[in-house]
């Protein structure tokens, strides 16, 4: 190859390389500009229109790094649209309940710093479940735990942990409260926290970590609420609150709350005579609650809440196998669906039930006289037929030789249906166990299952002789 040919060849190769590089730079430039503009757009699932991402959301976005030769481009991915929960799916069909969680708080207190608590409950946001309880402002192995049998002191706070995590020293204290309820509307948590003087208490409404509203006592006699989860449908949360006598006529009101703000208050109506400590669940398009009549009945009151027009109705669970404690034996107990049965109505315990067509699932203490043992079963016709007593699918949760306590319901939304779950408070210490000076609890949690299941007993399990005094 002569010198001229060499020059021509080298020139051709150089020109080709330059052209390729030029085209690559154009491609990089086009890609950069395209990604720059697309990072501020997201597709709305509602109408397929392009919506601008709000700048305030960018801090929560996921950042993807895209590498093009030596150029680094950050692409912002628009987050999913956060929506209110509507609970419109059907209730899951179940055959019974399967074990889900147990926190073993009392056993762990023998060798660790665990809060003294009572009135526990469970509630879930769209992605995770949490356990709550009212702390006594002290750990168990602490002299402040003496005489913690008392319900209402200014040091009590609402505690919140992931389900299954005992209330250790690092636990978050959500608010000041000796009575409470919590629920998640799909966007943020609402906490209803009651504290203050018995004759002039205050309920604070905390939404998304901020105090939004409050209400004072309306009957000057221990304003109190559910001690389990409230329910939110399409952004409206309902909570049942009572103020007045615990063994006589009281003033029960249902509060409707939107993002922490009270938007309406409805008085209790219907045939229920006394209502407190309600266990509520979504029954689209409304909310249904099973409560405690501490005055006249050992059959449990039912409160139906219409979220759209704020109307209220109430009656009693029809099952002749009644759910409260104390109660008459099953042969002589009764319920006519409309009125309290006037059988050992004075005193009681928080509990739960839920309808399943014409039937009812329910839980109760095994003992008819004390908070000992715990059982669940289904009563055929127990939702619609007065004094129905045909029991099936009975399960022992805590054997009759061990203590139980309050119990309540919470709901979990699955892919195709809404499951019902419950917790049982396992009380230990005073008054029954006088070797120690404290009163506290652990919990056990079960959820509905469509599968098969075995048998067992899941008591607290702590040896009181090994516990701090």
From Swiss-Prot:
Annotated stretches, region: Involved in apical transport and lipid raft association: 11-33
Membrane topology recorded in Swiss-Prot or TrEMBL: Single-pass type II membrane protein
Known glycosylation sites: 61, 70, 86, 146, 200, 234, 402
Keywords for the protein's UniProt record, in alphabetical order: Calcium, Disulfide bond, Glycoprotein, Glycosidase, Host cell membrane, Host membrane, Hydrolase, Membrane, Metal-binding, Signal-anchor, Transmembrane, Transmembrane helix, Virion
Top-level EC class: hydrolase
Regions that span the bilayer: 10-30
Pfam families associated with the record: Neur (PF00064)
Reaction(s) the record says it catalyses: Hydrolysis of alpha-(2->3)-, alpha-(2->6)-, alpha-(2->8)- glycosidic linkages of terminal sialic acid residues in oligosaccharides, glycoproteins, glycolipids, colominic acid and synthetic substrates
Keyword flag Hydrolase: yes
Ranges for region Hypervariable stalk region: 36-88
GO CC terms of this entry: host cell plasma membrane; membrane; virion membrane
Binding site for substrate: 118, 152, 276-277, 292, 371
Region of interest: Disordered: 326-350
Description of how activity is regulated: Inhibited by the neuraminidase inhibitors zanamivir (Relenza) and oseltamivir (Tamiflu). These drugs interfere with the release of progeny virus from infected cells and are effective against all influenza strains. Resistance to neuraminidase inhibitors is quite rare.
Annotated residues for binding of Ca(2+): 293, 297, 324
Membrane topology (Virion surface): 31-469
InterPro entries: Glyco_hydro_34, Sialidase_Influenza_A/B, Sialidase_sf
GO biological process: carbohydrate metabolic process; viral budding from plasma membrane
Renumbered residue ranges of the record's region Head of neuraminidase: 91-469
Family of the protein in this entry: Belongs to the glycosyl hydrolase 34 family.
Name of the protein in its database record: Neuraminidase
Source organism (scientific name): Influenza A virus (strain A/Memphis/1/1971 H3N2)
GN (gene name): NA
């Amino acid at each position: 190859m002569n010198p001229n040919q060499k020059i021509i060849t080298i020139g051709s190769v150089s020109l080709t390389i330059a052209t390729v590089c030029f085209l690559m730079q154009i491609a990089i430039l086009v890609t950069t500009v395209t990604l720059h503009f697309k990072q501020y757009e997201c597709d709305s699932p509602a109408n397929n229109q392009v919506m601008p991402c709000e700048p305030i959301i960018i801090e929560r976005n996921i950042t993807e790094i895209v590498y093009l030769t030596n150029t680094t481009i950050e692409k912002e991915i628009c987050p999913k649209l956060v929506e209110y929960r509507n609970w419109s799916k059907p209730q899951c069909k179940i055959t019974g309940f399967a074990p889900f969680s147990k926190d073993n708080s009392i056993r762990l207190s023998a060798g660790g710093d665990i809060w003294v608590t009572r009135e526990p409950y469970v509630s879930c946001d769209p992605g995770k479940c949490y356990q709550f309880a009212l702390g006594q402002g002290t750990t168990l192995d602490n002299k402040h735990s003496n005489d913690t049998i008392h319900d209402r002191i200014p040091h009590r706070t609402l505690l919140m942990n992931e389900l299954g995590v005992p209330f250790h020293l690092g636990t978050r204290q959500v608010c000041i409260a000796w009575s409470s309820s919590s629920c998640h509307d799909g966007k943020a948590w609402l906490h209803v926290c009651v504290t203050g003087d018995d004759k002039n208490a205050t309920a604070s409404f905390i939404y998304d970590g901020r105090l939004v509203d409050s209400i004072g006592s309306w009957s000057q006699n221990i304003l109190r609420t559910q001690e389990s989860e409230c329910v939110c449908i399409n952004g409206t949360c309902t909570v049942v609150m009572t103020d007045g006598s615990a063994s006589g006529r009281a003033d029960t009101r249902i509060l409707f709350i939107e993002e922490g703000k009270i938007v309406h208050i409805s008085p209790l109506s219907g045939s229920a005579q006394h209502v407190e400590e309600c266990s509520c669940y979504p029954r689209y398009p409304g909310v249904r609650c099973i409560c405690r009549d501490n005055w006249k009945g050992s059959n449990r009151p039912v409160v139906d809440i219409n979220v759209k027009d704020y109307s209220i109705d109430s009656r009693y669970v029809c099952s002749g196998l009644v759910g409260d404690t104390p109660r008459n034996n099953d042969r002589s107990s009764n319920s006519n669906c409309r009125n309290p049965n006037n059988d050992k109505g004075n005193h009681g315990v928080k509990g739960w039930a839920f309808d399943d067509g014409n039937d009812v699932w329910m839980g109760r203490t095994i003992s008819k006289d004390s908070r000992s043992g715990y059982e669940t079963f289904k009563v055929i016709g127990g939702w619609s037929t007065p004094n129905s007593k045909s029991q099936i699918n009975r399960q022992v949760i805590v054997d009759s030789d061990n203590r139980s306590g309050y119990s309540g319901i919470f709901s979990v939304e699955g892919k195709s249906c809404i499951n019902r779950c419950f917790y049982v408070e396992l009380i230990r210490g005073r008054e029954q166990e006088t070797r120690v000076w404290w009163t506290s609890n652990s919990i056990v949690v079960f959820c509905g299952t469509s599968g098969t299941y075995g048998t067992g007993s899941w008591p607290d399990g702590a040896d009181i002789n090994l516990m701090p005094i």
